Amino acid sequence: MQGVFAKAVPEIFSCESGTPGYSFYFDLIAPVWRNCRAEGAIHRLCSLMRKMGAKTLLREELEPNDEIRQEFEDLQTRVGKTLPSEPSAIRFSFFAAPCRDKDKWRDQLPVTSFLGYAVVLRAELPTDVPIVKERCPSGEMAYVLEAATRPPAWVSENGNGGYAVAGVTNYYVHCQREFKTTIGPRGASREYAPKGAFFCQQNGLTHVCAHAALRMILNTAEGLVDHKVTNRELNEILGIDHRKTFASKGLSVEQIREITDHLNLNVLAADFITFPTVDYAEWIYPLVESGYAVLLIFNPIHTEGHVVAVLGHTMNSDKWDCEAHLAYRPEAFGTYHASAAWVDHFVINDDNFGMYTCMPPSYLRSKVLPQYDLTQRARFAIGFLPPELDVPPYFAEKASIGIVRQLRGVLQPNPGNRWLQRIWEQLDQPQKGIVARTLGCTKEQYVAHLKATVDSDGHGPVSAISKVLVNAPDHLWLTEVSLPDLYTANKHKLGDILVDARAGKHGGQPMLTYVWGWLPGLQIPDNPRPGVTPLSWPLTGHIPVLRQAKVLGPCHEW
């Protein structure tokens, strides 16, 4: 929280694992949360800091800024009474570095050792108010107004007075940015800036889980809004008057769309109740892989909905079912392997359970039709995209695989083109199939990717780019074609299909527009058909898949 100062010099604690005298639970959680029920998120924060090797904790009571004052004012308006005692805001800041001399904390806690911070609001509520009895029976409320930490990583001294960060294996947080925070009192402060995702909690009285999920996305994803989004702003957009309105069942999809429309955001939406045959994980994954956050609405139980922010994914290249499901039941699982099959978790921020938690896709896949049971089922998803992008990548991927299959029907490969021959063989065997991985990219990114690539046969980099590609639209959906073993072992591919990320219109209906593509040794023609000879292409082997550089960083992969 930038520009928000402490009332006094920070309290400094040694919190290193194994150090006598400090417990995250008894010394941090219990005194602040006491009888409050919403402590799952702070437990997650402390567990994350413990695993990342936190050695020093700073605790400060803050001078309230406008946002903090608004939170307390709205709470008082909601309960309709003066709060029994003065509410407070506490900031916790975590460092991987030890602090041997507490008077010199600004010198001894380097920027590279900063793991993250959390601002917690505390308020005592009058227990004779019905809504307080229902929602906060103890009268003691505490919740995270704002937090930002590094994604899960190993943080260690690098020997040069700084700290090195190595991301957790196969753990990708695609949506992140830098968050500046000011630690210390006025005149004796220092600024730190972790790079990660924004986190916050609902308080259940003036804002709910949808507020939290929206704020986590809007305050993290770059290019969506030009200011920090607060709970009061969202309530004002919806015309919520805390003296009259209480969102006891959360916000509706229509209210969420009212907010996105008011902020002039470009979104893609999917209704998995109306279209239960659309696999929600296959719909979400290309957006997340592209760096676009997704708001996911689901039912933990039949009668209750919940909203979370999807910011990344983990990958398990050893998953058994990715190939086995097609091998054993090809009639039930389609004609190709969506790369989403190797996603073993979506990385989500859940205001109930904390930041960077891992939700397995299978948790929200129900075999019962939605009209009979909504329990543990994805209901609705909203992806937040750059302006003008209106083609769902889910459909771009299906169309791209259709083009490859269409080409297979009219073209026999040259006997020397072994990799194209291998693709055709996989396509011809229902129990084998090919892999499709779809993500968004700009034309500039894609051209740079090709020009920097040498294939497994030693061909490349590609110096002559197709004229079609030079004149391509700026925003594209890229579907990469691979084989299961090649994708999981090498993270390599054997071809690309590019689709315009903006839908053309024909008779008022959106249309997918094929731009260009290649497979080993050839360029894929528009509308492959008998008698059409594909143009040659210099790459005949496999090349690395395209990565979004912002999520790679120093990390381990398997």
Over which residues does each language-model region extend?
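Residue-level signal for functionally critical sites in structured catalytic/ligand-binding pockets
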Residues: 179-186, 203-204, 306, 329-332, ...
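Active-site-adjacent substructure of cysteine-protease-like catalytic cores
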Residues: 257-339, 346, 556-558
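Generic detector of well-ordered alpha-helical segments enriched in charged/polar residues
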Residues: 46, 69, 73-76, 235, ...
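Short loop/turn segments at secondary-structure transitions that flank enzyme active sites
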Residues: 215, 220, 302, 314-316, ...
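Noncatalytic regulatory segments and standalone regulatory/sensor domains
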Residues: 1-173, 315-558
